[in-house]
């Protein structure tokens, strides 16, 4: 958490150092969303706030152009409603070549969603 001290901070780490389960645990602690993008053996993790991660269409297109895949993101909360992809989630996924991503809640439960 010290590498992501506040919303809108990001860090690049090696792939084996962080998983979506880790981000789910951070979400449970902070109440904030986190997004993870993977390129080769590195992962870009971005800390959001209580309602969103600040990745717009332009940023998503840039990340896709740099070769990143959207591994997934978290939604704060403990029920299955937290696992529903928003229209914004689907719009961001449209920027990437792959067709699916995942949403994790604060309990570590997840759901795969499509564009």
Regions found by a protein language model. Name each.
Residues 1-67:
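Glycine-rich short-loop/terminal segments
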Residues 2-4, 12, 54-115:
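Active-site-proximal loop/helix of nucleotide/amide-processing enzymes and allied scaffolds
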């Amino acid at each position: 958490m010290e590498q992501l001290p506040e919303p809108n901070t990001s860090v690049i780490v090696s792939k084996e150092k962080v998983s979506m389960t880790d981000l789910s645990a951070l979400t449970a602690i902070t109440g904030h969303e986190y997004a993870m993008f993977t390129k080769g053996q590195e992962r870009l993790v971005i800390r959001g706030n209580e309602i969103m991660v600040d990745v717009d269409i332009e940023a998503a297109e840039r990340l896709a152009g740099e070769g990143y895949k959207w591994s997934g993101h978290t939604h704060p909360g403990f029920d299955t409603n937290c696992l529903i992809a928003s229209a914004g989630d689907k719009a961001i996924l449209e920027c990437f070549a792959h067709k699916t991503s995942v949403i994790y809640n604060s309990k570590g439960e997840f759901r795969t969603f499509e564009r």
